[in-house]
Amino acid sequence: AAVLLENGTIVLGNNQENVAYPSGMCAERTALFYAGAAYPDVPVKALAIAACFKGRPRKEVVSPCGACRQVMAEVIRRYGRDFDVLMIGEEETVVIKASSLLPFSFEYTG
């Protein structure tokens, strides 16, 4: 995954696997969390997601899991702006707004 920030910085992330499943983390969250830690005041402009299998790009587009979608919803709330998500496959790329991936996200109301 790659996060493009509003200032032009690109932050990369990859899957972090762990034998103590489900302790690993998806590439999307790795990149978004790193961007939030390293550039806390810079909004996200876009997030690109791609995957390979045995060194080759997947033919199908890659869609984020529910946990990643929730994190995206919280990034939108944090900065007050939506961002593009590019789901990349070998044969096509789908571009969609992050807000449309999880229309009924959890929200802290405490």
What are these regions (language model features)?
Residues A1-L5:
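Short beta-strand scaffold segments in enzyme catalytic cores
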